[in-house]
Curated annotation (Swiss-Prot):
PANTHER family: RIBOSOME MATURATION FACTOR RIMP. The gene is rimP. Required for maturation of 30S ribosomal subunits. Belongs to the RimP family. Its main location: cytoplasm. This is Ribosome maturation factor RimP. GO terms for biological process: ribosomal small subunit assembly; translation. One of its GO terms (cellular component) is cytosol. Keywords: Cytoplasm, Ribosome biogenesis. InterPro entries: Ribosome_maturation_RimP, RimP_C, RimP_C_sf, RimP_N, RimP_N_sf. HAMAP family: RimP. SUPFAM superfamilies: YhbC-like, C-terminal domain, YhbC-like, N-terminal domain. It is found in: Cytoplasm. Pfam families: DUF150_C, RimP_N.
Length: 169
């Protein structure tokens, strides 16, 4: 049995030495297809060297301490990508001002999916400005523009099922 918490402790310790944040540690698959996927980040972006250092050190420690017993596994270390998952309070604080896509556990005003600009995060609640992007089913208006109605939604972090950044290209 793999002790995922023990693995996470090792990954956190190694990442901290390089000034990196651990976004996610997960095991996937079974048998010969087992994969340990580690996602790391830092404000100025993750480099290939960052991934290489973490991969080499974590691999050595896991092998020496025999934390992952049995068959072989593949170790993958990567950055979170442009559409990274955000879940911790620190993530929402860091990415205030960014475009986000959020799914809630229960419907709010008849919807579970919201996309817009993360306006703020305070007291465990995020505020999303829905005017930042056209919403599903919303059509572009032709002719004279109607007055813009501010559309915002406030969601408690505990109600967030999934949240990701939306790349702005």
């Amino acid at each position: 049995m793999i002790e995922i918490e023990k693995v996470r402790e090792i990954v956190e310790r190694v990442a901290r030495d390089y000034g990196l944040e651990v976004v996610e540690v997960e095991f996937r698959g079974g048998g010969k297809a087992r994969m340990l996927r580690i996602t790391i980040d830092k404000p100025e972006g993750v480099t290939h060297d960052d991934c290489s250092h973490v991969s080499n050190e974590v691999s050595t420690i896991l092998d020496v301490e025999d934390v992952v017993p049995g068959a072989s596994y593949t170790l993958e270390v990567s950055s979170p990508g442009l559409d990274r998952k955000i879940s911790k309070p620190a993530d929402f604080e860091r990415f205030t001002g960014s475009l986000v896509k959020v799914s809630t556990r229960e419907p709010l005003d008849g919807n579970r999916h919201f996309e817009g600009r993360l306006e703020s995060f305070a007291d465990g609640k995020l505020t999303i400005d829905l005017n930042a992007v056209p919403q599903r089913g919303q059509k572009k208006q032709k002719g004279p523009k109607a007055p813009v109605v501010e559309r915002k939604v406030e969601i408690a972090l505990a109600d967030v099922e999934k949240a990701n950044l939306v790349p702005e290209i």
